[in-house]
A protein has these predicted regions:
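Glycine-centered, phosphate/nucleic-acid-interacting loop/turn motifs that mediate DNA/RNA or nucleotide
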Residues: 33
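Strongly charged
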Residues: 2-12, 16, 27-28, 36-95
Length: 95
């Protein structure tokens, strides 16, 4: 029963990736429907912070007045230093 989990809560991932200073703020952004999730070509708005995200999912959201688009590369196990957090995602071009 070992191995990395294949999914993570959206708010927890956003916090671990250091896009938001607190997990409460990340949860609020998700609850307000301000995060879009693209999985297997289907786009949806997150309405719950507990919604699962997986490696390969794409997220679009606003941070500090800027639109941010990322592809999830890893789920992470903790909120680590910024260098570790940058390894959790790859930036995408916003079209």
């Amino acid at each position: 029963m070992s191995g990395a989990p294949d999914a993570c809560r959206a708010d927890v991932w956003l916090w671990r990736a250091r896009f938001f200073k607190t997990s409460t703020l990340a949860a609020r952004i998700c609850e307000e429907g301000r995060v879009r999730l693209t999985r297997a070509g289907l786009e949806s708005r997150l309405d719950k912070p507990a919604r699962a995200v997986r490696v390969g999912d794409e997220l679009v959201f606003a941070v500090g007045g800027r639109l941010t688009a990322v592809r999830i590369e890893a789920l992470g196990e903790r909120r680590g230093p910024p260098a570790e957090a940058r390894g959790l995602y790859s930036p995408l071009q916003i079209s």
